[in-house]
């Protein structure tokens, strides 16, 4: 994994996107964000991304799980760390889908520090003290 892996943050809440992007950069990650599934797919076509943080509940009919399903079909993302971050309650089927596609589930308001530590583990990085 790269020294400064780039993380794509998909969340429809501008405050969450901005906060996550800033904090990821503080912890030594590159960060880019998207508010919709279409924006995220465009980012993935144009930028090298090594990890993803996806919100489940997006405005409209698409979800972060839709991106999870499509991205795992692409060989370059087969082993990419994907964290699912949601404030809602998921069904057993949704949780099974997340597990089956090798993603990791975090419920808001899980501390961002916990999420970054887990991302550090998945990317093989040590977070600066």
Model regions: which residues?
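Non-catalytic signal-transmission and effector/linker regions of two-component phosphorelay proteins
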Residues: 1-8, 110-129
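His-Asp phosphorelay/catalytic-motif detector in bacterial-type signaling
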Residues: 4, 48-50, 75-81
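Acidic di-acidic motifs
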Residues: 11-12, 55
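Two-component/phosphorelay signaling modules centered on CheY-like receiver
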Residues: 14-32
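Acidic catalytic/metal-coordinating carboxylates
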Residues: 36, 62-66
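Short amphipathic alpha-helix used as the core "switch/output" element in two-component signaling
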Residues: 42, 65-78
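Active-site beta3 strand of CheY-like receiver
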Residues: 47-58
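Hydrophobic/aromatic residues positioned on beta-strands within the core alpha/beta folds
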Residues: 85-86
């Amino acid at each position: 994994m790269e020294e400064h892996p780039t993380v794509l943050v998909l969340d429809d809440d501008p405050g969450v996107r901005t906060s996550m992007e800033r904090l990821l950069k503080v912890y030594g990650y590159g960060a880019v964000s998207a508010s919709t599934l279409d924006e995220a797919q465009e980012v993935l076509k144009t930028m090298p991304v090594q990890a993803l943080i996806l919100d489940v509940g997006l405005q409209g009919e698409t979800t972060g799980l839709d991106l999870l399903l499509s991205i795992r079909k692409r060989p370059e993302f087969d082993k990419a760390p994907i964290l699912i971050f949601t404030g809602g309650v998921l069904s057993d089927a949704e949780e099974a889908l997340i597990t089956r596609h090798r993603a990791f589930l975090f419920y808001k308001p899980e501390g961002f520090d916990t999420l970054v530590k887990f991302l550090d583990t998945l990317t093989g990085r040590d977070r600066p003290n």
